[in-house]
Swiss-Prot record:
Pfam families: Ribosomal_L2, Ribosomal_L2_C
PANTHER family named among the record's database cross-references: LARGE RIBOSOMAL SUBUNIT PROTEIN UL2M, RIBOSOMAL PROTEIN L2
Protein name (record): Large ribosomal subunit protein uL2
Keywords for this protein: Ribonucleoprotein, Ribosomal protein, RNA-binding, rRNA-binding
Region (Disordered): 221-274
Gene: rplB
Amino acid sequence: MAIVKCKPTSPGRRHVVKVVNPELHKGKPYAPLLEKLSKSGGRNNNGRITTRHIGGGHKQHYRLVDFKRNKDGIPAVVERLEYDPNRSANIALVLYKDGERRYILAPKGLKAGDQIQSGVDAAIKAGNTLPMRNIPVGSTVHNVEMKPGKGGQLARSAGAYVQIVARDGSYVTLRLRSGEMRKVLADCRATLGEVGNAEHMLRVLGKAGASRWRGIRPTVRGTAMNPVDHPHGGGEGRNFGKHPVTPWGVQTKGKKTRSNKRTDKFIVRRRSKK
């Protein structure tokens, strides 16, 4: 995998930094594992904007990725690595011995021809999925379940991983990248290793149009608006003279947003401040 800085042949190319992976498949994706993906433009079923700064962008198909990894005891061979426009990580197309193909998240170091397996008896190596009670303490894992059988929810983006730091009875304690320490049932599954494509964070889009290709619209500062549009709007100069708030007057920048008290008991230590 290489980091390529483009030559300044035009203003739009001057700052572009690309991540080039020659191992990625250059053809079309595997059609039976594709689904139609409609654009919402950030609107809900009433046509109201529920998420700002979304709209346009290139058409995409959704890749049906197997986050459950529940095909136990059947070895699979990695056929190829592919780009997935719906996530920062790359995905791998695997062929199981019984003839079924599935997409999985491509962990670091996985390449075409490698063999992977799921289940209690799987070997301790990157790409294999086991219940966390069978994974040694200190291991780094990704695609971690929070409820047994629900499928992986933690550590799924490029370069992400979670470390198993303790095992106590029916629970394991995980250290997340944010610094949070959290308890999860030991029967929950996780995939060994960390997610590949960690260089994704080094890319530079280089121009506004590259964001538009991805369906991201401009974000206008509140202080650049009029008073009718935003609490920070209007006035002489750039000072808005109050605590930062959202367009609807709710405090931002540091305000706590977590409201799921039911699972507070599973958080051993809160995430560390940056």
